[in-house]
Structure formats: C-alpha cells, structure tokens
Design a protein with these regions (language model features):
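Phosphate- and other anionic-substrate recognition elements at nucleic-acid/protein interfaces
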Residues: 3-5, 12-148
Length: 148
C-alpha cells in the first residue's frame, strides 16, 4: 500500500489541509488550520504528516495568471523553507515537498460550495479546506496521468 500525501492551501490567516486516501486516488478535506505563527503552524502540519503516515507534502503555489510571482508567491517560498528547515531539525528527511499550481482553486472551491448550496457563513469556514482538496486531487491526477 502506498503512503498518503498531504495537500496544503496556505493563506495568511488559515491553512486548508487535505489528505489522499491510502491508494493515492482521491483527496479528502481534513481541516482548516487557523494560523498562529510559522513555528506552531509547521509543527501542527508535521504532526499530521506523521499521524497520516504521509510521504509527500503538496503545497499549492499561488502565481499570477500570467505565471509570474506575486506577493503571496514569495510568502509560499518562505513557508516552504521554514517547513523544510523544521523537517530537517526533527529528522523527517524522507518526506518530499512539492509545488502544485493552485491558480483559481479558491474560485473553483467557492463555485463547488455554492452549487452544493452551502451558506455563505459555512463557505467561509470550509473554503480553504476545499481548495486544499482541489490542489491535492490535481496532484494525484497528474501522478495517475504520468503512470499511463
């Protein structure tokens, strides 16, 4: 059986988190983490990596539609660096960290939630988790496509 993968939609206030099923076919929303500080945030994420026995962390990379970096992209680079530093310092060297293009995932997530008739208040609570599901599923689909 394959190890799971964990997907992250990193924002300024929250991190949407999703995990793959053990076969690496589908993504399920796990939680929306309220951000409190980079050290605690990365610690909580690495706890989830251990708990779900993940071998890959997939981080949504937020670029502008034309493919250039945005202010948010720079924050993603910084987040990944801090996460990898924490992984090294805690002996988690075998975990792969990869980028997944996340342009428009939040827009798509909102559309899915609206179509499912989720109230505006509830959408706000689950939008980042849903975006993480889309990031994770996109990554899993790309792996399946590469195997063909």
């Amino acid at each position: 059986m394959m190890k799971r993968k964990i997907g992250l939609d990193v924002g300024d206030k929250t991190v949407g988190i999703a995990v793959s099923d053990p076969l690496g076919i589908t993504a399920q929303g796990l939680m929306t983490l309220e951000r409190v500080g980079i050290r605690k945030d990365t610690g909580k994420i690495l706890d989830l990596v251990k708990e779900y026995d993940c071998d890959t962390i997939v981080i949504g990379l937020n670029k502008k539609l034309d493919g250039t970096d945005s202010i948010q992209t720079e924050k993603m680079y910084e987040f990944r660096t801090m996460l990898e530093n924490k992984m090294r310092s805690t002996g988690m060297k075998d975990i792969e960290v990869v980028w997944q293009d996340e342009r428009l995932t939040t827009v798509m997530a909102e559309k899915v939630l609206i179509e499912a008739d989720v109230s505006r208040k509830k959408r706000k609570q689950v939008i980042d988790k849903q975006a993480a599901v889309l990031i994770m599923q996109s990554y899993l689909d790309s792996l399946a496509f590469q195997k063909k």
